Amino acid sequence: MPGVPEYLRLAEENNGIGSVAGDTVLITVPPESLRSIAGKMFNEFKAVFRTCAGVDERPLNNHFSIIHLFTDDKAGLYIAVKSYLQPEHPVAPSISDIVPAADWCELEAWDLLGIEFEGRVLRRLVLPDWWPQGVHPLRKDFKYDEKPPVAIARSEKLGLREEAGTVPLGPYHPALHEPEYFELYVKGERVVDVKYRGFNVHRGIEKLAESRMNYQQVNFLAERICGICGFEHSTCYALAVEKAAGIEVPERAQYIRSIVLELERIHSHLLWLGVAFHLLGYDAGFMHMWRIREKAMILAEMLTGSRKTYGINLVGGVRRDVSEEKKSRVLSELRELESDFKKVVEIALSTPHVKKRLTGTGVLPREDAWRLGVEGPVARASGIDRDARRDLPYAAYKHASFKVPVYTEGDNMARALVRVMEVYESISIIEQLLDKLPKGPLMAERVEIPPGRVGVQVVEAPRGGDIHFVMTGDGRPYRWRVRAPTYANIPALKVMLRDQYLADAPVTLASIDPCFSCTDRVVLVRENGVAERFTLGVGL
């Protein structure tokens, strides 16, 4: 198993330099070494590719840079592989043929920063068709409130399959809760191909944060990335900044973060189970799951002042404490929730038509799950034993004992069972942390954030790993990159839907628990009706 020495040696072998800061290894190599180092890390070291971030560093050192972010979950390490690129014409070699999951973030870096990637087709991904060519909004010379002239729209035609029927799904559809567009190609009752077009509500939060917000204000922006797992995003951002600045967060604040994170996981999974039962026509299960979920929402409001757990995190700690009275009530309500949930979910998953519709449908083989870099319950249902709470521990998770449920079937039932078992584990984690909750302050004594530092953090959200990359600047992030787990999971739908009955498409789509507000920029392209190409970008 590789460790820090092996990664530092890898940097030297590729004409680069390596350095270590805490749990992060930074490897800086010339662009021509990127493919070699990415291949060894992905294929030999089995490092997990998380995302990449383009950065306009011209005001700092007259260069652009591209940073590929990996994690070595067995060693508990973050590995950032960085290359500096020329300021006039930034070009880097593509690694997407070696690491398929890199396809998406390369396209995003091209679209938003104008970084070209040799050896691949570059397509407009995030920006609308009317956006003028050559204008890249994440460059530092583009002002956040600038309105570029409207160019003539050049809509891209995504080659239809003439031999198959077309079934549009969205952008507004009862099976979708946000505006997205799926185009299913069918022969008879079977799905043979899928096209996906999103990007309808891109909000440009990275540019907003880098342009006009201070570090603490970004917390409140981060938690609004997602309507379900906002606390995961604000925690991930805060941890990344704290790591970059070397801020020691009080232990009590770390415990409170983990408690709220697990409460959010419970209500998210209960919401998903209810939606899944509704899509299967089992509305009794839907009603009961949402009835039980209401207990979690009441606890969230009691602990945080909001059913949506907003306004808790700050860089350096948390804003609300947990009293002894609240501890007692949480423990009592969770015991009742667990008992109620156990009765309902056992009945629901043994209901014949629910069991039949979930078992054997939407299968994602393990090799495809690894190749595409899927996250969370989608990965664990396909036999990939990965969970950042255990592998890359943060907040107070090192003080809790829990199991990571893993199934090998890779079908819709396995993804449901992962979430069911995680509800039980989350209840156990909250009980353990409340029992051990230490005394002490809620905020670090000093919160000083020097410029020029880098922090990378993964937080295991209900849907999988949230990744936040922060390069510190003067009073605000110089670069903030966000990658939501749905970003990694949507491309797997092409595999999961292939050869499935059209009637099973909605529940298979829902089985990844997609959050389009987190991800909302995906295209699935079939070139010339033959060659397949995934393209997706998510920088929020």
Where are these regions (language model features)?
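Catalytic cofactor-binding cores of redox enzymes
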Residues: 131-191, 195-540
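Terminal low-complexity/charged segments
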Residues: 1-194, 268, 353-361, 368, ...
